Amino acid sequence: MIVRAWVGAGRLATRGPDLVGSCLLGLCLVGAPLAAQTQPTAKLRPEFVAIGPGPMTMGADATRDPQAFDNERWSAAQGEGTLDLPLFYLSRTEVTVAAFGAFVAATGAKADPRALDAPAAQPVAFVSWPDALAYCRWLEATLKASSGTAPEIAQHLRDGWRVTLPTEAQWEKAARGGDHRRYPWGDTPRRDRANYESAAPVAAGQIACPECAYGLTDMAGNVWEWTRSPYQPYPYDEADDRSGLEADALWVMRGGAFNDPVRLVRASARGAAEPGARRAFIGFRVALVAR
């Protein structure tokens, strides 16, 4: 499957499997095998961080951020928009090779062999959009069945909440803290706060970022993260977050990757790929949301 990308209002472009990081015209695209495990241990269980309800800033333009791409602009009239989101939770780190390996061992899911052929603590890559959603469904079921699930999370699951991918808006609120910051930690690029312009991913959560919104790690760089939003021009519409479009949409990815330039790891930068894309620079993290 080929990853497709635009940058602004430019030409359609393609990338083959040998290409692992680039930006074309506003939309940018971008170990040893694990022992079998049947369900998450405490170490593999995600740490969910509450992202409180309230307003958020979404989008950017060159007036406020000279690095912004055209597809980040909210509308012809304004560079940024404001949304109000209810409470949701996001995992503190990206899903690791170890955690994804537990899912594969428990379910017999057909994973790309390269997804598990990496250090256990690294963020899993070579996962498609359906792969990520399948992991979410398995994780939800195992958390419901586990006596070790945090009481707050267990209660939400009993109340009908689900484990899934974050929407594009949820991801951006978590990355920006609801304000105008360009990066999860502020407005200035910092190589000590994110893994970008480098040769390979690092362990999920390895790079501490005490200034980052909500204490989340790797919201900039390391691997692009799938969302459950199909790519659409702004202004953002939550009604477009339809998880049944697997064959018909480009799906938004956020955060940039280890081999991307700093421009692509800004909190408002938007990437997208076809749902079947499995690449060395695409991973995900999980969300807990009300149905």
Model regions and ranges:
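Bacterial N-terminal signal peptides
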Residues: D18-A32
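N-terminal secretory signal peptides that target proteins for export/translocation
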Residues: M1-R15
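Functional-site microenvironments in short loops/helix caps that host divalent-cation chemistry
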Residues: T57, D61-E72, A118, P123, ...
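Disulfide-stabilized, aromatic/cysteine-rich ligand-recognition loop
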Residues: T38, A42, P46, P210-C212, ...
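Residue-level detector of short, conserved catalytic/binding motifs and their immediate flanks
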Residues: G81, P86-F88, R181, Y214, ...
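A short glycine-rich, aromatic-capped structural motif
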Residues: T41-D112, F126-L133, R137-E140, A220-G221
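Bacterial Sec-dependent signal peptides at the C-terminal "C-region" and cleavage site
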Residues: G31-Q39
